[in-house]
Amino acid sequence: MILRLLPPLLLLGAVGCSRDTFFQPDARVAYPAPLPPGADSARVTAGRHYKHGPLNTLLLGPHYRQTWSQPVTLPVFKPATVVAGGLKFEKLGGGFQTTSMTLVDPSGRSYALRSIDKDPYKTLPKVLRQGFILGTVRDATSAGMPYGAFVVPPLAEAAGVLHTTPRPYYVRLDEQGLGHASERLQGDVVMLEDKFSNKNDRVDALREAEEFEESDVVLSERYKNQKNRLDESAYLRARLLDLWIGDWDRHEGQWDWAAFAQPDGTRLWRPIPKDRDQVFFRFDDGLLSWVVSRIVPKFRTFGPHYQSIEGYTRNARFIDERALASMTKEAYLRTAKDLQQRLTDDVIKQAVRQGLPKEVYQREGARMEANLRARRAQLPKAAQEFYRLQAHQVVVPGSDQEERFVVERLNDTATVVSVYGQAKGGKDSQGAPLLYQRRFNPRDTHTVVLHGLQGEDEFIVSGSVAKSPFIDIYGGPDEDIVRDSSHVGGLRKKTRFFDTARNNELIGGKETKDRTEHSVVSHAFDRDGSGR
């Protein structure tokens, strides 16, 4: 990615800022005059260092520079009184661009405190961590709306999406109440946000949750056994909300999950979006930044139209693939239309008015509201395009327990994939639970990828048709069996088996392509985004 961006970055760097001291020394407008000890509020700017002259603004883009440099009044962060009983420092966060830390109250409830401004220094190769390039990449932070995250909670609430409720503060330049980490946020504009990491963190909507985990843990649990499932309907709803507000940075690390016990003994994990740093993004409004946006489609401006659904969803490709596998076109359109009904003009107006500081609302409020209304009208069309991208290749994983994958090529417009779990009476008994089922149309879906993972799995493919998606079968490390009696018109074989050459049984037909090999890499599956 950095290599692709290097030519336009060099262009941008030619006009970018190369100051060694890039960031404002204190967010307060009155700096260096000291803030009175008992002050409850302060007049601050989120980042007046992003304000540039006419030439730089023409080339790099106006972005949200005026909003970053707009003086606003924010409450002073007081660790001892910000919540009942006060907050104490627990640990530093691991973010590369923002400074973050975990704080806890006396009941054990945890919060995240993090800077609104970013420093991408650590994300760059060492050779680029200086001069024009560093200054330009730092300057790109001004494309983010610094107060956008505070607009989202009422919108998410109306949409039926679980959410955190961040609040903005100013940290005194002489604040010492955060222990040895105090100096990391002194003089900064920050947000305080709920964390969902233990049972003490429950809010009303999560009162019945058994457990909270991050995506890597949840995915590991999902693939370990058949008792853990992802709430794909809730995830789809959250992702369409992401599209509507232009949040393109929704990778797997941007989600918490809450586990809810189900009557059948399974656990349903519901998503909780977090870290709304990139909502209402405004980037391709300069001559050179426009060039960059054509190279990297996710860097588009939040406006009345959805400029690139592929760009908006690229960062979330991994988690989307794993959390939307059963969602049909009808589900996408039904959810989009439901959101249209929920996200009324009044909801939009109240969210924007309450979320933005009044000085920022006067500048940006009307434009943001108009864009949200226009995008709401186009949401079903955006959802249909999102479906098209997700439906092209669908990954259907099993678990580390035994499963039976049944593929029925019914006709030229319908191939049904069903996954069955273990029956109570044993492998060959009746009544095996249905874990997954979806009907695929080859006009929408090119390939369905089946992963057995661990356990001795069985794959059965049948039916004679003229058209069908490719069925790619990856058995896993244990002994698996594939039975393929299907036939699809044309010269290409549409059932492909990928696994190790030994310890598997392949009963294939004319439609089967044997892609087995000696390496265990042949059936590798990335469970949690680590690449392992």
What is each residue range found by the language model?
Residues 2-8:
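Sec-dependent signal peptide recognition
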Residues 13-16:
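C-terminal motif of bacterial Sec signal peptides marking the signal peptidase cleavage site
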Residues 18-20:
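Bacterial signal peptide processing site
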Residues 45-81:
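Juxta-kinase regulatory segment immediately upstream of eukaryotic protein kinase catalytic domains
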Residues 77-213, 267-268, 272-314, 439-441:
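Conserved ATP-binding subdomain of kinase catalytic cores across diverse folds
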Residues 141-142, 259-437, 442-447, 455-470, ...:
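C-terminal catalytic region of ATP-dependent kinase domains
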Residues 143-153, 158-165, 224-253, 258:
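A conserved hydrophobic secondary-structure block that centers on an alpha-helix together
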Residues 172-247, 260-270, 282-285, 295, ...:
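ATP-dependent phospho-/nucleotidyl transfer catalytic cores
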